[in-house]
Each structure stands twice: as C-alpha cells, then as structure tokens.
C-alpha cells in the first residue's frame, strides 16, 4: 500500500522557523557570549527576531493557502491575530524587564532563549489543527516557563514556585493527554476537522467523547489559571522573578485561549450545548475566586494573580456564549488585558529593580513624589476594575452585552457583582498611592524604553475606551475567518 505524504508548505511556518532557528542559535552563542555585554547582544537579537516574526506574520495575512502538513498546522487570519498578540505579550514585558534583569543579575543569555522557546510553543498552540501539534506546543511552552519560574536559583520562593508549577503542570498535562486519548478512541482521529465531521453525524452514545472533552478543557483551564484549576497561580506569581511574572501573566493565556478556540469552535462546535454550560460554570467560579480571594492580599503580585483569575472568568463568558458576538468580545478583552498587564507590571518593575515594590504599602505616597507614575498606575487599576471611560470598562461591557444577548442573565448579573467587589482591591492600590504619606523618596530612574512602553500602554487603555472602533473592526474580521 502506497503511503500518501501530506502537503507541506514551509512558507506558512516561516515565523516559527525564524524563532526556532534564532533560539537554537542563541543557545549555542550563549556559551561564548558571556557577561553583561554578551547578554545584551543576545537580548537585542531575541527582540529583533520577535519583530521579524511579527512582520512576516502580518505580511502573510490573506494568503490563499491556510494549512499545511495535512491540516495539522493552520495559518489563517485568526492565527495571525493571536500571534501578533503573542509577540506583543512577549516582547513588551521582555523590554521593560531589561534594567530589572541586569540589576538582579538574572539577565544572562539563557533567560531570553527560554523566553523564545516558550513563545514558540505558544505559536504552535495557536496554529494547531490537531491535538498532536497542540500537545507539543503546550509542552514546549510549559517546560520553558517551569525553568523561568525558578530562574532566581538562590531564592527559596522562586525555587518553590518553579517546583510547584512543574508538579501541578505535569498533572494537568496528564489529564489533557488522557482526554485526547478518549477522544481518539471514539472518533479515530486527533485532527480537529475530522472530529468536527464525526460529531455532525448521528451517534447513539457520546459519553466517551464528552468525558474526553471535559478532561481536555480541564487541562487547558490549568494553563489559563481558571478556577478551580488556579491553585498554582498566586504562589507562582509571587515567587517567580517579577520579569517572569509579567511574561507569564499574559503570554500563556493568549496561547491557551487560542487553543480553546481551536478545540471548542473548530473541533467541538457541534457540541456547544455540552461545553457552553461548562465554560459558563468555569467563568462564574473564576470571577468569584478572583474577586473574593483578592480582597485580603497585601502583596501586589499576588493581588494581580487573583486579578488575572477574575479576568479569565470574564473572557470565558464570551466563549460560553458560543456565537460571533461572544468570540469577538473575548478577543477584545484579551487584547486590552495585554496592555493593562504590561503597564502595571512595567511600573512594578521600576520599583522592584531598587529592591522594593512587592507590597502594596511600598506605594505609599507615590503620587506626591512621582505623579506621572502614580497616574499611569491609577489608569491601569481603574481599567482593570472596569471604570468608564477606560478600555477595561468597554471590554467588560462587550462581554456582558454578549451574555445578555444569549439570555445568560444570571452569568451577566454575577459578572457585574463580582466586578464591583474586585474594584475594592484595585482602589486599595490607588488609595495607598494618593492618600497615604510617602515613606521613601521614589527617586529611582526609569529608562526610555520602559517609559515609552508603559506610556503608550496607558494611552491605548484610554483611547480604546473612548474610540474602540478600529480594534472592534479588526477583531470582527478575525472571528469571521474562524466561523
């Protein structure tokens, strides 16, 4: 019997090829390029590779062929949009962390190589047309982040964060793999298109495939830190170096949400009646945990961990809705979340490089000494709380409107209530900056690139809250390519 080779078009994988070649080349170069100057050279090349990959991705939008390797690798408009978000959620935290990494003696070459490998795994997750590619992408991303979380080798909290993330992440990967095996056992395929075709036929028993789907969703929920699969997030966010926390707070979530879109919409679209309520339940639990558990936090990184759990819950509402309006709301929310996250962590890193800034009380009187920094932090906190007219309000409004349009009134009402509760801990940060008396001079410098990135993030958070038209239009075209 002749073996039929799948169609192979490596041009569709050019961004992945660029990143993988550069990452492996820099891994070898780091053995020779030692010291601070070598690390600077490696980080510049890594940042350059990210920008090259972004340009290639943008130039490839609208290509006639959208898949290769027999449909296992997909490069459609949705993939391009999510990859651009992935590049931004990698490049921006990397750049704002440069000074922090140098002062903390963490910025050697391997750090940036691991960052590239983690992002490469995310790129494969976004372009997956098969559970095989999806799982390989998840493992590549996860293994790199396990090491990054424990990168501060002399710090017990960092070591604990890396080990805890590794142990729980390994368990989540096992659950995901078992779910994939159940799905394969029923459908006879791991390709999303084949699974979708199978589900459109009339079958008497769906128990096996339903159990498999629940396990797959559970595994992916761990990656986005959705409750009740969130137990790792607060400890890992707090213990990992702040530069790593800034990176892992957004980048893995972008990749995992893209994977959820691929699995739920492309493979299991006909089963929305089954997975829709599961997503709604995860959304409500995540919003509740994020809002209530964050109230008693005094560590700002731990607070932002619970904040991110809550934000994941709001985004999951859009997935639960299961139509174009809901999916568009998810992408709008994720895009805005990237810039809120980069801005907030960029300001935390300014203080961290001077040896403080982990505790909320470290921000006492910041407005009196550095009014510009305090204003930017207030913008990001107000936006995360969903206060108009900022982008965070517009993002939550889109989510709640989609839920109401789908008659998910209970979920929408709970979302509004939990959003109001979570506003208390965002306001606690603002109150500390503006109404408490300063205990230090806050005379730390801020490099030009960090100022530019945090400043532009603040401008976008304000601008998209008032004029969201361009973002909404881009997202609408992206979702049309997925439906």
UniProtKB/Swiss-Prot annotation:
Q: Which residues cross the membrane?
A: 8-28, 45-65, 78-98, 106-126, 131-151, 166-186, 206-226, 241-261, 275-295, 303-323, 330-350, 373-393, 399-419, 452-472
Which terms in the Gene Ontology molecular function aspect does this entry carry? NADH dehydrogenase (ubiquinone) activity; NADH:ubiquinone reductase (non-electrogenic) activity; quinone binding
Q: Which reaction does it catalyse?
A: a quinone + NADH + 5 H(+)(in) = a quinol + NAD(+) + 4 H(+)(out)
**Biological role stated in the UniProt entry:** NDH-1 shuttles electrons from NADH, via FMN and iron-sulfur (Fe-S) centers, to quinones in the respiratory chain. The immediate electron acceptor for the enzyme in this species is believed to be ubiquinone. Couples the redox reaction to proton translocation (for every two electrons transferred, four hydrogen ions are translocated across the cytoplasmic membrane), and thus conserves the redox energy in a proton gradient.
UniProt entry tagged with the keyword GTP-binding: no
What UniProt keywords apply to this chain's record, in alphabetical order? Answer: Cell inner membrane, Cell membrane, Membrane, NAD, Quinone, Translocase, Transmembrane, Transmembrane helix, Transport, Ubiquinone
Q: Which HAMAP family match?
A: NDH1_NuoN_1
What NCBIfam families is this protein classified in?
NDH_I_N, PRK05777.1-3
Q: Describe the protein's quaternary organization and the partners it interacts with.
A: NDH-1 is composed of 14 different subunits. Subunits NuoA, H, J, K, L, M, N constitute the membrane sector of the complex.
What's the name of the protein?
NADH-quinone oxidoreductase subunit N
Q: Which domain of life is it from?
A: Bacteria
| InterPro entries in the cross-refs | NADH-Q_OxRdtase_suN/2, ND/Mrp_TM
One cellular-component annotation, GO: plasma membrane
GO annotation, biological process: ATP synthesis coupled electron transport
- Give the gene that encodes this protein: nuoN
List the EC numbers from the record.
7.1.1.-
Which family does this protein fall into?
A: Belongs to the complex I subunit 2 family.
State the membrane topology. Multi-pass membrane protein
Location within or outside the cell: Cell inner membrane
